[in-house]
Amino acid sequence: MFLAKSIVCLALLAVANAQFDTNYASGRSGMVHLFEWKWDDIAAECENFLGPNGFAGVQVSPVNENAVKDSRPWWERYQPISYKLETRSGNEQQFASMVKRCNAVGVRTYVDVVFNHMAADGGTYGTGGSTASPSTKSFPGVPYSSLDFNPTCSINNYNDANQVRNCELVGLRDLNQGNSYVQDKVVEFLDHLIDLGVAGFRVDAAKHMWPADLAVIYGRLKTLNTDHGFNSGSKAYIVEEVIDMGGEAISKSEYTGLGAVTEFRHSDSIGKVFRGKDQLQYLTNWGTAWGFAASDRSLVFVDNHDNQRGHGAGGADVLTYKVPKQYKMASAFMLAHPFGTPRVMSSFSFSDTDQGPPTTDGHNIASPVFNSDNSCSGGWVCEHRWRQIYNMVAFRNAVGSDAIQNWWDNGSNQIAFSRGSRGFVAFNNDNYDLNSSLQTGLPAGTYCDVISGSKSGSSCTGKTVSVGSDGRASIYLGSSEDDGVLAIHVNAKL
């Protein structure tokens, strides 16, 4: 009996641990959030850019039918009408094709899933043609009725966990995930996505759902589809949106036993550092000492689709594409540092925080336009196509699991470190030049700085760094240069 219990416990532990695995293809790391992109465009991006540049995954916007709202704001995607795969990004056939094409080039798909709630009042018509009556909690496209929702109440006090989890977030009709029928419908929806070949989920508004209910839902999910290259028995990677800056009734620690969490403290802290409110020298103990969840439970980012607009957490400290020099430095640090599972943001430009993606006619999403230097236009920012970011994804892949070594700082805002003997980075956020002989940890030779340029054959389009037989190199980063970071690695050796 004891042996049987032990086996059951070990089996449960194996299942639990499996959902912390990103399911990335070997030798790849780092995902990108292609916010509001169309499925056909993502498929092409996987084949033409993400795959060749070593990206491991793509987070996509919600895939299921949402309410059509006036002026088509981005947040309409977070107001579900049904679980039909029909949105402005495309239909089920297009989504299935995208997942297959991305998997074929080693890029995994992670879906932003919304099942805390359904649409708020006014969301009577959906992108797939379904109708609903949010005011009476009737969503025939699922179908859900008033029996499937929590009683109507507002969230006014984040120190009351019951209110946060049982009441309505900004008027969105709050589903009761403890209801077995709701659980059935959610599992059916997620399992369908698993059948189509996705690798995991970002669970929207997880903080507003009871961990015990989520545990039931996650525990019922089928294993990943081996036809898409996943190992037998693999579980979906789960990352839960839990905004925990401290001082509230709900803690991320209630969720880290179930999956990874969106570590908003990382975003807030990295913004403060590279905006000059904290010194770079303090980054020497970056990680859990800063109040972050454990590395394998932390999805880390510089900004996300919410907090780049002032929603969520971080406020004015959050760095976005609108502060490009510091944004590139913070992104390079995140990708160079071994902590967490990094996610790169890929935005559309906005001046109004409600503004939706670029369209051709006010409704249909426009495709990004690509320039000769890899950057985007047509209203798309495409931070993932900035050389300083995509070359650091390659850096992360090159250094693998090698530890941080050879830490150096000037007691202020100049730092450098190596990742074992495979990569080296230096940062200058002071208002004077960095000019020092530093230990890179790398083998002797000439290396291409992958921030100022790229390795092209046996030459470099940017600066080069000469490493001596002792591993040292003269590192220069002028305070007025376009980039306050320099990076070299073994795959960029000339």
Swiss-Prot record:
Alphabetical UniProt keywords: Calcium, Carbohydrate metabolism, Chloride, Disulfide bond, Glycosidase, Hydrolase, Metal-binding, Pyrrolidone carboxylic acid, Signal
Pfam families with a match to the protein in the record: Alpha-amylase, Alpha-amylase_C
Residues of the signal peptide: 1-18
Single GO molecular function: metal ion binding
GO biological process, one term: carbohydrate metabolic process
Chain residues that bind Ca(2+): 116, 165, 174, 208
This enzyme's EC code(s): 3.2.1.1
Binding-site residues, chloride: 202, 304, 343
Catalytic residues, chain numbering: 204 (nucleophile), 241 (proton donor)
Cofactor annotation remark: Binds 1 Ca(2+) ion per subunit. Binds 1 Cl(-) ion per subunit.
Disulfide bonds: 46-102, 153-167, 376-382, 448-460
SUPFAM superfamilies noted in UniProt: (Trans)glycosidases (SSF51445), Glycosyl hydrolase domain (SSF51011)
Cofactor needs: Ca(2+); chloride
Catalytic activity: Endohydrolysis of (1->4)-alpha-D-glucosidic linkages in polysaccharides containing three or more (1->4)-alpha-linked D-glucose units
Site note Transition state stabilizer, residues: 306
Positions bearing Pyrrolidone carboxylic acid: 19
EC class: hydrolase
Family annotation (InterPro entries): A-amylase/branching_C, A-amylase_C, Alpha_amylase, Glyco_hydro_13_cat_dom, Glyco_hydro_b, Glycoside_hydrolase_SF
Family: Belongs to the glycosyl hydrolase 13 family.
Subunit annotation: Monomer.
Protein name: Alpha-amylase A
Organism: Drosophila yakuba
Gene name for this UniProt entry: Amy-p
